[in-house]
Design a protein with these regions (language model features):
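A short acidic, often aromatic-flanked loop/helix-cap motif at beta-alpha or helix-coil junctions
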Residues: 37-42, 79-83, 127-132, 152
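Conserved RecA-like helicase ATPase core segment
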Residues: 1-71
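Core RecA-like ATPase module of SF1/SF2 helicases and allied nucleic-acid translocases
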Residues: 90-194
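Short secondary-structure boundary segments
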Residues: 197
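Non-catalytic alpha-helical coupling and interface elements of nucleotide-dependent molecular machines
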Residues: 25-28, 49-57, 86, 115-120, ...
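Inter-lobe coupling/hinge region of RecA-like P-loop helicase motors
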Residues: 28-36, 56-102, 143
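Well-ordered alpha-helical segments embedded in enzymatic catalytic cores
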Residues: 19, 80-84, 147, 181
Length: 197
């Protein structure tokens, strides 16, 4: 088995990280830990760890960056999306951007704003995109809009994390799940993450 309790974001589909954690306690199993992070610039990993370590049901573990250059971390409000879209338009490297959303309904809103800025984009269907389709979509010179769940396992140079991440909900599971979702979203970014919440 391979797993990362910090990225266990499928409780709503019946996924239970406790099963995995219990297996790790089994004396008949040998556990190996992958501690090096090769993807994220140091400060992106730092903010992701700050978010996840506030979750109540995660193991404490050592994750260290292998990239020590500083990336860019921006935290702003959702209503500033257009400002950052204009920067993408000016830069012109559309394929270097993901816009990750919490819920599917935000994809439509973002699509409209990208069209208003004349920025090419593609959207992904959660669970309905084959590997061949995924490769073709990823190679297009267009901004990719997808849910955080769909983005799991992917990476890009720049990520805008857009939406309502209710990480202060009173429910124990809700708080932990939302922190894990936010962690996954932040860690898709290699060089720059813009969090619009």
């Amino acid at each position: 088995f391979v797993g990362d309790d910090w990225q266990s974001i499928y409780r709503f589909k019946g996924g239970d990280v406790r099963i995995f954690l219990n297996l790790m306690q089994n004396p008949d199993w040998t556990s190996y830990y992958l501690s090096a992070n090769y993807r994220n610039a140091k400060n992106i990993m730092d903010i992701a760890k700050t978010v996840i370590k506030q979750a109540d049901d995660v193991m404490d573990k050592l994750v260290y960056p292998t990239r020590f250059e500083m990336g860019e971390v921006i935290v702003d409000t959702k209503n500033k999306l257009k400002k950052y879209l204009r920067q993408i338009e000016k830069d012109g490297n559309y394929k270097d951007w993901f816009i990750l959303v919490r819920v599917n309904k935000d994809i439509y809103e973002i699509s409209k704003q990208l069209e208003e800025c004349d920025i090419p984009y593609v959207t992904f269907k959660q669970g309905g995109t084959s590997n061949e389709e995924l490769d073709a979509l990823m190679s297009e010179d267009a901004v990719k809009i997808l849910t955080v769940h769909t983005s799991k396992g992917l990476e890009n140079k720049n990520v805008i994390l857009y939406g309502n991440f209710p990480i202060k909900q009173p429910s124990y599971h809700r708080n932990s799940d939302e922190r894990k979702i936010m962690y996954v979203g932040i860690t898709r970014a290699m060089d720059k993450v813009i969090i619009l919440n």
